[in-house]
């Protein structure tokens, strides 16, 4: 993308954020749908770091005695609920978490996984044999899409989630969430094996009694813990 195209993209997104904020101010209504842009505002982490204040985001890492890294590069207000899931799993496994902390338009902080090159994430990925990444996508149906390069384990995980009462499916490498790109941060580990878990907005909302930035931390419910326990059981049984 040229510099002129990048500037135009940023201007468009800023205008959108202004209009969305005006809508909220005038009506008190905040749309629950997630707006997706065909192009991220920032082409990589260095680009984001150059243009965003440090208090707009947070990076949380924890190294555990485990060959599994839980990766959540779109946490906080970017893909709500993935931060809380990652932090819960950090009690047992290594974790890298990038969180959007802006008051609005956290989607501007979304850097697609193929371009996500935050130094600590790259370093942690290289030290672990396997990566399980957590993402969110917009869907009114409670559902889980499971991709990644570790296709056999992805199928097993989908089967386990379905047995535990969730709706889940393993997706092909050609799916838009397939996660097979060589430069995908989740694939930059020792083995190149990854599982990419995409959780619908409806399912993430169901995991909390109050699905807000401030409310999620203290309103985790049975669905939340059923998900994390299912994933932990899967890791114990398959790695």
Show where each model-derived region lies:
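Function-determining sites in protein domains
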Residues: 14
């Amino acid at each position: 993308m040229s510099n002129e195209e990048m500037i135009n993209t940023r201007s468009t997104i800023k205008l959108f954020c202004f209009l969305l904020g005006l809508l909220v101010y005038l009506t008190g209504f905040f749309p629950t749908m997630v707006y997706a842009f065909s192009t991220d505002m920032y082409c990589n982490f260095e680009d984001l770091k150059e243009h965003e204040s440090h208090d707009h985001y947070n990076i949380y890492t924890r190294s555990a005695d485990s060959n599994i890294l839980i990766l959540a590069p779109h946490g906080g207000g970017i893909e709500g609920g993935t931060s809380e899931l990652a932090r819960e799993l950090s009690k047992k496994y290594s974790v890298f978490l990038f969180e959007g902390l802006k008051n609005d338009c956290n989607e501007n902080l979304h850097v697609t996984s193929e371009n996500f090159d935050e130094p600590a994430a790259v370093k942690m990925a290289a030290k672990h044999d396997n990566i399980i990444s957590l993402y969110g996508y917009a869907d009114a149906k409670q559902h889980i899409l499971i991709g990644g390069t570790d296709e056999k384990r992805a199928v097993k995980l989908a089967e386990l989630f379905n047995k535990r009462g969730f709706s889940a499916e393993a997706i092909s490498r050609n799916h838009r969430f397939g996660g097979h790109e060589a430069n995908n941060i989740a694939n930059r580990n020792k083995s190149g094996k990854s599982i990419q878990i995409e959780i619908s907005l409806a399912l993430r909302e169901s995991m909390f009694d109050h699905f807000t930035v401030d409310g999620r931390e203290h309103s985790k419910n049975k669905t939340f813990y059923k998900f994390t326990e299912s994933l932990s059981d899967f890791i114990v049984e398959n790695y």
